[in-house]
Each structure stands twice: as structure tokens, then as C-alpha cells.
Amino acid sequence: MTRTTRIDTQEATKHKDLPPVPSPLSLSSNPNPECLMESKSLGRKNFKKLSLDASPVKSTSGSLRSSDMMSIKEPTSLRQKRQRPPPILHLPTASSSATSTPTSNITGSSSASSIQFAQKSPGSGVIVSQTLSRPSSAGGIPSSGYSSLNVNQSNRNVDPDNVVSTDMILNQISNLDLTSMNHHRQHYQNSHHHLPTTNRKRQTVISSISPTKSSAASSPLEPQIQSLPASSQSPIATTSALKLNNKDLLTLKQLGSGNSGSVSKILHIPTQKTMAKKIIHIDSKSVIQTQIIRELRILHECHSPYIIEFYGACLNNNNTIVICMEYCNCGSLDKILPLCENKQFPTFVLKKLSFAILSGLTYLYTTHKIIHRDIKPNNVLMTHKGEFKLCDFGVSRELTNSLAMADTFVGTSMYMSPERIQGLDYGVKSDVWSTGLMLIELASGVPVWSEDDNNNDDDEDDEDDAYVRQGSIAAERNGQNSPSRSRKNKQKGNGYNSYNGPEGILDLLQRIVNEDAPTLTNKINPVTKLPYDKYLCQFIDLCLIKDDSVRKTPWQLLEDKEHFFKGVEEGVYDKEHKSWAKKIRKCKV
């Protein structure tokens, strides 16, 4: 042992920069921990000196006890942070109040309406209940039906498939059980009648169109009308999932315009939803404006796959109405007709179209007692999927006339029924007449009242018919036209022929009332040189019965499942129809 120590000492003297290696004898003679650390660090100056002052209690002998070493643990804050449970947000489901057990705790002992938020104290693991109170009415009426929410919000621990937005939380807070609250409030006032009470009015925001659904008890023709806000612009109607404001509407392109209105394609920026916006100039009379707003409220409650969806409307201070509705990317039928092969609608498309129009008319009348009053190609739209939808229908003459102001009176009167022109009482059967006239135009490619009664086959007649089929402006005639030929002058207009001057308008109205109803029976298609479909001709003849007492209603016509509408509901023509609609969409682009 002595020799080994001597050899180590000699080896250490060779390196003068390092202190000698301590021997076991020196360690045993100096048991001080500081000396021990100094000896093990070899006395290096850059070695960080460890302080053992903050260590656990030393023993009397100066050495550390093993029990004290086990008591050295990490800080409490880190331990609590690691042991904190993930946040939990308890929200009642939509059906929890009626059928299922509610997930929220009902608190009825508080004197004010409150919502409890559970949080952890930063210093300990105890959960502290924090309450956000609402001011209650005087008298300390207890509240009930409020939800207890645990909102230790942390996006890391929220299930992305079950994310609850802030709007939903606000809706849960605002849509409280007012009936239960009023019952408890009344019971508390009866038992504490000596306490002073203060009547508080609940403030409600009224939009220009009510978003509520119509009930069977109240008639849609007699809605509850609220007073309009006194502002330069009435607010746009809102639905449960969509809120419209003028500042959120971005115009993409103009779809059409007229003397009294325009239609444009817009984008609703918050939802990135494409819509169609129609601006219509109306009368400045407040009575008419109020009537139009009332009707727009009713239109907002119409929900059918055959009716254009109505998003909302607002009344501007410059006597214009802005209507936001569903956008159909294929446009109206008068714009689709020139894109069709031979400028005629195929028979299977006419079957789908007739079924959609009659179904839409049936829904409007049976559910809301609404008559369209303006069935024509301009007011029937089609989507890229081949869905046909009715638009621009009203409840009264004020709205119907306002919506039709962009078109000429002749264009609308061409499709009027005889009883309506004569000023007689008319109903939904008047729309059936208009449907029959429109089917003739779409099947033949020629407006209904363009042919002369005498059926003259001279070159001038053929030339006029060719101009009508091509949708171009009629050629100018040299010299004076005879009175019998004045009604043969055509204009491109909005896809139909118009009669120039008051005499032409009166001539048109007299023809509708006095002449026989138009028909395709026993006629040859000028393009295919073949007769028209037999069932199509029979269906059109049923629609164009001049005596409205004999003419069928839309739902009566839909009952014929064995002839014209055979296979329509079963989807026999769906594949062929969708392929045709896809071609039309490509032509539009």
C-alpha cells in the first residue's frame, strides 16, 4: 500500500499544472464534504462551486442522510401543471331540455342568474368555482334553468370533431327557458309580495323579414307585422344560419338589367356563398312599401325544392328593394332556349320541367295560399344539376307588379289567362294556363302568338318565323305594313315577341280572349319534320282550356301518372336529363 501511494505521488509530480491526487489517507483524515468536493474537482478554478446550504438538514456528524436526499422533489407548480386534467365543456344538447337528461347542472339557489366556470387554483389542485352573474330584476327573484359550464379553454385538448363555437355558446346562453323563468318569478312574487318589483322589458331585434317558421294555427296571409326600424335602411332578413349585411355582399358580375331593376351575381363574404341580388325600384308610398315588406316575410317562409330559396331583403332609402336569393348558374329558361339543340327543349326535359312547375305551384297554394301570377320562361331558373325552380312570385299585385317592372307589360301579358285579362276572378288555374303557353314556346322554339290565324305560307311569313326562331330583331320592311301584318313585327326583347304600340297591345289581348287556345296537336315540328309527342300535346291542351271552371288545378294534373308524367317520379329520365343539363352548363361557360 505504501509503495502504491508513493508511485501515484511521483506520477502526479510530473504534471506540475495539476494538484496531486489525494490519497485515501488524506480523505479519511478530512471528512468535510466541502473538502471532499474540492479534492474531487482537483482544485480547478473553472469548476463551479456547489453550495450545500440549501440542501436538506445535515446530521450532526456533517454527512447527508439518505432520507433527506429522497425528499428533494421538483417544484409544486410543475407537478400541478402535469397533473391538470383536460378542460371539459358541458353544454346541453338541443333535445336535452325535452327528451334526454340535461348535461348541465340546474342551479336554483342563486339570487341572480349565473353561469359557473370551473378553474383550478394556481397554487393547489383544488378546483375553484367562479361565477359570472347577470343583473336580475329587483326583489332577488331566484333563477332556474341555467347551465353550469366548465370552460378551462385549451385548443390543444378540444376534440376537433366536437368543437363548440363561441356563437353556439352565446346561443345557449340567450336561448334560456323563459317559460320556466317566468313561472318561478311569478311564484316567487306571490310568496314575497311585500318585496318591490320592477317590470323589465325584454329587448328584441326585429329584422325586415321574420325568420320564424309558420305555424298551422296562423294563416301565412296574415302574419304578425312588427314596426320597421326608423333608419335610412331596413335591415336585411336573417335566417338561423345566415346573416346578411350590405357591407358583406361583393358584386361579381351583372346578370341583367332593365328600366326599373337589375340582377347581379354576388358573394357573401363571411360564408363564401354565391347569391343572386335583385334591385327593384318601387313606389315611394309608405303603404306599398309596407305591403311589400309584409309579403317578403311570407316568401321567406317558403321552403321547397321547386321554389327558389329566399335569403333576405332590405328596403333602401332611395325607394329600392334589395332581394337576395339563391343563385342558379344555368340561368332562366329564356336564356337556355337558344343554347338547346335545334333551339328546342327535348320532350324528356319538358316532362321534368312540367312536373317541377306544377309541384311548385301546388306547394305555394296549398301551404301558403300564394298564386304566382307571372309564370313565363324568365321566371323559371335551372341549376347545373337540372333542377327547375320558380322565382319572382308574390302575394299581392303590388309586389307582382314591382318584380315585373324590369320586363315590358306585353311580355307579361302574353302569358296571361283570358279570365285575368277580362278582369274576372282568377286563381291558381291562371298559372296553369301560363304553363301551357310556356311549354308550347319551349317545345317549338317559337313564341305562342307569333303565327297568323290565316296561316299564310308566303315568303314573308317564313322570313318572320325564321327571325323569331333565331331570337334576332325583325327585318325592316320597306313601305307601310298593312294593319293585318302589324302584329307580325318582332323584337328580340327578352326572348319573346312584342307588339309595337298600344294598338299592338290591344290586338294581343283581343286574340287571347277571342281566339281559340293555341295547340300543338296535329302539327309538325318545323325542325325535325316529325309530329310532336302525343302525350305532350294532350297535356298542353289540358292546360289551355279557356273555361277556367273546366281547367284542372296543378295537383289534379299531377295525378296523371300513366301518360305524360309516367316514369318521372321513378327517375326514368334522370340520367338523360342530368347529361343534358351538363351540356347546357358548358355552353353557358
Curated annotation (Swiss-Prot):
What spans are recorded as compositionally biased (Low complexity)? 24-33, 92-121, 206-220
Q: Where is the composition biased (Basic residues)?
A: 185-203
Indicate, by first and last residue, each region the UniProt record lists as having compositional bias (Polar residues). Answer: 57-69, 127-136, 144-162
Enzyme class at the top of the EC tree:
transferase
GO MF annotations, alphabetized:
ATP binding; MAP kinase kinase activity; protein serine kinase activity; protein serine/threonine kinase activity; protein tyrosine kinase activity
Domain of life assignment? Eukaryota
EC assignment: 2.7.12.2
Q: List, as start-end ranges, the regions of compositional bias called Basic and acidic residues.
A: 1-18
GO BP annotations listed: filamentous growth
Residues modified as Phosphothreonine: 408
Domain Protein kinase stretches: 249-565
Question: PROSITE patterns recorded for this chain?
Answer: PROTEIN_KINASE_ATP, PROTEIN_KINASE_DOM, PROTEIN_KINASE_ST
InterPro entries per the UniProt record, alphabetical: Byr1-like_cat, Kinase-like_dom_sf, MAP_kinase_kinase, Prot_kinase_dom, Protein_kinase_ATP_BS, Ser/Thr_kinase_AS
- SMART domains linked: S_TKc
Query: Could you say which protein family the record assigns here?
Result: Belongs to the protein kinase superfamily. STE Ser/Thr protein kinase family. MAP kinase kinase subfamily.
**Protein's name according to its UniProt entry:** Serine/threonine-protein kinase STE7 homolog
Q: Report the source organism.
A: Candida albicans (strain WO-1)
State which gene encodes it. Answer: HST7
